[in-house]
């Protein structure tokens, strides 16, 4: 029942991710002309706490490092396939690139745990024990990314709020757009994404009648360098962008938290 509900939310979230939101929470005016609420104050849902990944699909591509050349669901173009088929983990290790599969386009797919906190009133922080990575989601308007691209890039976030009117319970989601990325891998077996990639994410939380809480993350990767661009008028799974869904269950505390370094294999 839970898995079916997650799939239904997944389908709905993909549609929302690709379309304009019905109602987007802007940093609006505060009560009685006061300052606008911070992102933390405006939050329609609470994402903070510890979450463990649920590997309910693609087990052999997520729990294990797939063999070279195995990327059946990823719409690579010819250059992307060439690079993926030439993957050599020893070269990544020698170059100090063990973390290429731990960038923003793939880190949430790796098995492990998340710890979500507020870095400050307008910045949401996500730490992963797998690869010991940190992501920062900036809700307040920011300057264009400066400096060198990074594994986690620069992530702009906004609340998308639903309900709260006419007796409908208030809820919502987080939409995140990440740019300014270093090249990385969409899978641990060297399936590439480029510095031109843009990662769109949609975070949805749901609560079951028994109290269990789940986090569903929709990820869309748009990469004109390595993902296949469809000919005009053609639609199909063989072309980008690349969309996938990842689920987590909330856990009580940090008892299972196990920070581990990046691995190229």
Identify the residue ranges that each predicted region occupies.
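PEST-like low-complexity, intrinsically disordered acidic/proline/serine-rich tracts
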Residues: 2-6, 10, 20-265
């Amino acid at each position: 029942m839970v898995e079916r509900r997650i799939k239904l939310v997944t389908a709905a979230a993909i549609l929302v991710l690709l379309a304009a939101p019905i109602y987007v929470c802007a940093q609006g005016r505060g009560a009685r002309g006061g300052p606008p609420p911070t992102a933390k104050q405006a939050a329609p849902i609470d994402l903070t706490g510890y979450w463990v990944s649920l590997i309910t699909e693609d087990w052999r591509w997520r729990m294990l490092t797939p063999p070279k050349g195995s990327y059946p669901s990823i719409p690579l173009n010819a250059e992307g396939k060439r690079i993926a088929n030439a993957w050599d983990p020893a070269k990544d290790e020698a170059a100090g690139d063990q973390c290429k599969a731990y960038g923003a386009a793939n880190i949430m797919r790796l098995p492990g745990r998340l710890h979500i906190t507020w870095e400050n009133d307008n910045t949401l922080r996500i730490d992963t024990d797998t690869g010991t990575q940190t992501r920062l989601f900036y809700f307040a308007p920011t300057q264009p990314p400066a400096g060198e691209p990074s594994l986690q890039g620069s992530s702009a976030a906004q609340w998308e709020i639903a309900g709260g009117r006419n007796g409908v319970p208030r809820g919502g989601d987080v939409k995140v757009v990440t740019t300014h990325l270093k090249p990385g891998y969409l899978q641990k077996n060297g399936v590439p994404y480029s510095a031109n990639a843009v990662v769109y994410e949609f975070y949805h939380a749901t609560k079951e009648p028994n109290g269990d809480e789940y986090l569903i993350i929709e990820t869309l990767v748009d990469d004109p360098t390595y993902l296949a661009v469809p000919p005009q008028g053609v639609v199909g799974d063989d072309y980008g962008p690349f969309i996938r869904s990842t689920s987590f269950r909330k856990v009580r505390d940090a008892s299972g938290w196990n920070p581990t370094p990046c691995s190229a294999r």
